[in-house]
């Protein structure tokens, strides 16, 4: 008989009991997000969801995303309560731009060693994001992978499926010269540009935990959860029918994201002087000596969503958005793109 000790999964660094404890902790979170179309609870091999009633030609829309290196900042600060909302926002905001209503969401949480408290905090944030978006958290995967991640470090990915009526898909094809562009404010950098942000903080030797801007801790400004625009935008679409295109301003800023929803011959003319850039962006620009054009190519600079409507629909759209609790403003207009011209022209860029 071998004298070698009997090895278990736990000896290899995987704690099945911890995984089961996490599932029990998060069942209530998932239940709070339940939509009537979702069939069954957590724990099955697959999650089932009916198409909501009332759709004539339903088209499913899917998306997946992560939160980039904002996660590294969350880990360094031991702040895990809002990163889940970031994850949901990055997915559902991408879905809503084509007019889709998010139906359900799944998450993937991978870690070297599962900390049940941290994971439960993250998933609670995911649940809060799902509630804000009106979609169900129907399942996910928690992978404890010793040797793949350092200690209790973790990575996140999100997956979302939504539905839109085929005849009501918003694809930018109706955008025309003279149309107006309306902006919705971001809460901060959202979930993009954090590799640059972290480099700026490192090179400038900023004491992030003891720095305040306008009386607010820099950590709070940088970790502010990504805004979820789903409900105000779906209300705008339903009540006005005015929306021709929408762009979620993520990595690539205004310069790279607006062209994704424009016809080839259209140019977005954006007046950078039309809004007061939040102080956190000016702080980052100054500390990193970042070129103004680079700021708009990497960061959202205070704009989280851009909406295109006809000029005669501007007031109705602004009023509808304000009624939904938003603070919209007209950020620019659509012009005809000259041959070879960029699809976004930024006017009134400040000299730096």
UniProtKB/Swiss-Prot annotation:
One of its GO terms (molecular function) is phosphoribosylamine-glycine ligase activity. Its EC number is 6.3.3.1. The gene is purM. GO terms for biological process: 'de novo' IMP biosynthetic process; adenine biosynthetic process. It is found in: Cytoplasm. Belongs to the AIR synthase family. This is Phosphoribosylformylglycinamidine cyclo-ligase. Pathway: Purine metabolism; IMP biosynthesis via de novo pathway; 5-amino-1-(5-phospho-D-ribosyl)imidazole from N(2)-formyl-N(1)-(5-phospho-D-ribosyl)glycinamide: step 2/2. One of its GO terms (cellular component) is cytosol. Gene3D superfamilies: PurM-like C-terminal domain, PurM-like, N-terminal domain. Keywords: ATP-binding, Cytoplasm, Ligase, Nucleotide-binding, Purine biosynthesis. InterPro entries: PurM-like_C_dom (IPR010918), PurM-like_C_sf (IPR036676), PurM-like_N (IPR016188), PurM-like_N_sf (IPR036921), PurM_cligase (IPR004733). It catalyses: 2-formamido-N(1)-(5-O-phospho-beta-D-ribosyl)acetamidine + ATP = 5-amino-1-(5-phospho-beta-D-ribosyl)imidazole + ADP + phosphate + H(+).
């Amino acid at each position: 008989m071998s004298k070698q000790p009997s090895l278990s999964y736990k000896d290899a660094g995987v704690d099945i009991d911890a995984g089961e404890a996490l599932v029990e902790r998060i069942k209530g979170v998932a239940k709070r997000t339940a939509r009537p179309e979702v069939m069954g609870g957590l724990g099955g091999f697959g999650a089932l969801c009916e198409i909501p009633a009332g759709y004539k030609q339903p088209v499913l829309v899917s998306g997946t995303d992560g939160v980039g290196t904002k996660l590294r900042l969350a880990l360094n600060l031991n702040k895990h309560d809002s990163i889940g909302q970031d994850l949901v926002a990055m997915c559902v905001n991408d879905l809503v731009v084509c007019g889709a209503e998010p139906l359900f969401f799944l998450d993937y949480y991978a870690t070297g060693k599962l900390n049940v408290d941290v994971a439960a905090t993250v998933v609670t944030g995911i649940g809060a994001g799902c509630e804000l978006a009106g979609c169900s958290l129907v399942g996910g995967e928690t992978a404890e992978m010793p040797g793949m991640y350092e200690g209790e470090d973790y990575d996140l990915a999100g997956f979302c499926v939504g539905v839109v009526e085929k005849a009501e898909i918003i694809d930018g094809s109706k955008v025309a010269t003279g149309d107006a562009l309306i902006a919705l404010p971001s809460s901060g950098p959202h979930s993009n540009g954090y590799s640059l942000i972290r480099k700026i903080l490192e090179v400038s030797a900023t004491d992030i935990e003891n720095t305040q801007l306008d009386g607010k801790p820099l950590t709070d400004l940088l970790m502010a959860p990504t805004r979820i625009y789903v409900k105000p935008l779906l209300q705008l679409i339903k009540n006005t029918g005015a929306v021709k295109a929408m762009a979620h301003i993520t990595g690539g800023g205004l310069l790279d994201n607006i062209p994704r929803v424009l016809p080839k011959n259209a140019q977005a003319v954006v007046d950078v002087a039309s809004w007061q850039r939040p102080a956190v962006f000016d702080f980052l620009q100054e500390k990193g000596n970042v070129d103004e054009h680079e700021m708009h190519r990497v960061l959202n600079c205070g704009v989280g969503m851009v909406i295109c409507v006809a000029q005669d629909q501007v007031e109705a759209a602004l009023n509808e958005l304000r009624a939904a609790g938003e603070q919209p403003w007209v950020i620019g207009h659509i012009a005809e793109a000259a041959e070879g011209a960029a699809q976004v022209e930024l006017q009134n860029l400040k000299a730096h």
